[in-house]
Amino acid sequence: LPCINEDPTIVVRTKVLPEGLPKSVKDSKNEVEIVEDKGGFYDIHVNALIYYYLLEASKLNPPILPLWLSPVQVRVIPVKDDFVQKAIEIAEALRAKGYRADVDDMKEGLGKKIARAGTEWVPFTVIVGEREAQTGVLTVKVRERNEQRQMSLEELLELLKGNETSVSLIPLRISERSG
């Protein structure tokens, strides 16, 4: 990870400090305040806060961001083109409940798609094949525990509960992203 930005420019001002928020972050070269007490209110330096979470995540095996901070919370991967539509339905159902989900519809093998989700630190990866399409029981890779589980969409929603967002700004299909 790069060195801490010594002059964070994004600040959130609040009267009530969220519980458990770190006060500062220190790497091998610098220590930067995350929270400044301004007497009656607090300034939270967002750049330093995000750096803190990246630094902490990089210490984990596998590395993982808090679910609320992950750009993509759930990646849905069809095992072949026949299941892209089912994958889209699952991702749209997750988005409708306020979660950041996308579909890896690239013309690549399953292994590459799973590896891509891993390099992007996606917390939950849903694999959709014939069995999942027929039974509705999803195969879900849970990054934090490095395990694969079978669960319904409702059970996945229960795992995600409390991490809803207002809108996903990420295109539904990976193939629709630029670059």
Predicted regions and their residues:
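TRNA-recognition modules of translation machinery and tRNA-sensing kinases, especially anticodon-binding
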Residues: 1-99, 104-106, 131-179
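Short glycine-/polar-rich loops that comprise or flank the Walker A/P-loop
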Residues: 72, 122-123
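Short acidic active-site motifs
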Residues: 110-114
